[in-house]
């Protein structure tokens, strides 16, 4: 966790809680370092540190680690050890659940008694195939004359003979800690301990939750303070909070946070899964709830965690079932009846906070609602670091870059991304892995590492879970695929890419970026293609909305669809919302009588309010495309909604040349094809028409190629002895001029001159209505102002003059 100084005016309590996150400085807090001598019972400290803590060489000390784990060791002085560090080997570290660089605390532990009896068992996977008496071979030499302190529940590794065996201390008598002296009895009867049971104890702690620093501070302040130090609230004279409601999109880590809190506080954790309480017998569901709360009160301090709380506490007026209503009432009375200092805290988690009964959301029941949202870039980096800490990563993996590219991903999506990258790594090694073999070569296992390439492949295959149903393959269209339209490209980059890639520039100049763009122009000029390219070039998420799909037959559902789409876009910001055929849902209001009770009007109103309500914080862009700009409602075209109106004209000669080149980029074209001549000849053709010409020429080439193949086959079958040279050898391997000539016979223009005049008239009226005052200049006294004024007036002048041509941007 980063160590940010809180601003002085923030609440002291908040300050205190982030101080929970940052460790207090204290002489007995030491940083874990790798041991030099590999002894399981010894830790070494610098002599000065030992002096400060009043320890002597050979003292038994108690060390506290993470997840409420502790163990006992013998302290030795070591000059080479740095002062604030403590050296311990891997065994001690795993007992304390810490890694190198973590902080542990050291305490004096003077009254460690000699043990009468200890019960020690081996761990099953380390004793496979070990024959003979374990006690004589391993334990006796390990404990002989060593006076080792042990702690119940610890694991330790003993090296002996050919291999190492891991043991677990099952029971110690008389206390949890004791020293194994020569007269201590050691029992090692019983079945070996299963490794799985051990691993399961290694549950999640605060270190395993990333990207929710602020929320974590709030939760710890609401949960740990009342459970650990109830006297704080008593002395101030307020009641501690009783309930916390966590809400947020699925996969953002609500249940994980609750688990981590339970493990780290050491409180009794009672988990209620919403649907499990239900029972078919009358009154049984309520009694299940009551039992859970009674159990928690008995074992106080405790945390009751209700997962998916919306399933057992829905709004009472909306539910038909009697049982649900009774359960909600029971939950309300139970939460009120929790004695204020019973040290029971109720946590609820849901991803639909608005479907919960409002009576539950008042103060005194769920006092605090905490939004566990989609993490930002720093949060995503934290989550990625947590998920990759046990992965074997190659040198070139750049987690920061990956966290930049994963907009809108929640924790679960990032976990899936890491898994997918690892799978990708395994797939590459599949040729050397034999599934039938019992074991895999250690060499192969060691050579595996997840590289940056694997992460990139995984990024291509995964998408944020918020966008699963409106999933859009981000199209593989780049700027190179689009011929011409240079001005439009630049305008688009400024509108969409700058706010995503340089947000700090907008802050510096104190303006929020513009939100919307409308492309209009004749069909087949690349409006949709441009939207695809911008989605691909700038690493934003892309949701494509087909206008007509929003309308449904149910009353009120069409508007709900619009709301839902905007919610999704906000969740996975930065996001480009692309409305294709905008005219189908944004026709002028008032003239749509008779269609589904004015559904189109209501959808438009919803659209307008959504566009105004888009928070400036979230970078969501709207791109509309239409070829009927004249029928779009004028309220939608005002600045602040779709403020950039971009006319995408028929391509001029240069653009046509570029389009031909872009279309034929991947095709083998003969030398005798003069693309410039084609571009000259296709005056008035749209981009789609030009693509069609290329496709047709390509088709003719393929047809000829296949005919040649058939001819060769026929000859071969008639005359098997014929030499290869006699075959028809002029193989058609490229598109020749003849193919284009043939193709041009069928070429046609899809946009008539009358249509173009309509678009130009519309563009001109816009230009005139907006070009008012285009000759504006500042007073000539200000020398600097004058030049900028001229520059500002320029674009209008040129575009108005060029309006007669078929290309407004010539």
From Swiss-Prot:
Q: Which domain of life is it from?
A: Eukaryota
Q: Where Phosphoserine occurs along the chain?
A: 41
User: Could you tell me one molecular function GO term of this UniProt entry?
Assistant: ATP hydrolysis activity
- Answer whether the UniProt record assigns the keyword ATP-binding to this protein: yes
- Indicate where the modification N-acetylserine is found in the sequence: 2
Q: Which residues bind ATP?
A: 248-255, 521-528
Q: Which GO terms describe its cellular component?
A: cytoskeleton; Golgi apparatus; nucleus; phragmoplast; plant-type cell wall; plasma membrane
Where is it located?
Nucleus; Cytoplasm, Cytoskeleton, Phragmoplast
PROSITE patterns found in the cross-reference section: AAA (PS00674)
The record's InterPro entries line, in alphabetical order, gives: AAA+_ATPase (IPR003593), AAA_ATPase_CDC48 (IPR005938), AAA_ATPase_domain (IPR050168), AAA_lid_3 (IPR041569), Asp_de-COase-like_dom_sf (IPR009010), ATPase_AAA_core (IPR003959), ATPase_AAA_CS (IPR003960), Cdc48_dom2 (IPR004201)
Which PANTHER family did the record assign?
Answer: AAA-FAMILY ATPASE, CELL DIVISION CONTROL PROTEIN 48 HOMOLOG E
Q: What is the documented function of this protein?
A: Probably functions in cell division and growth processes. Interacts with certain SNAREs as part of specialized membrane fusion events where vesicles from the same organelle fuse (homotypic fusion).
Q: What name has this protein been given in UniProt? A: Cell division control protein 48 homolog E
Give the species this sequence originates from.
Arabidopsis thaliana (Mouse-ear cress)
Lineage, opening ranks: Eukaryota, Viridiplantae, Streptophyta, Embryophyta, Tracheophyta
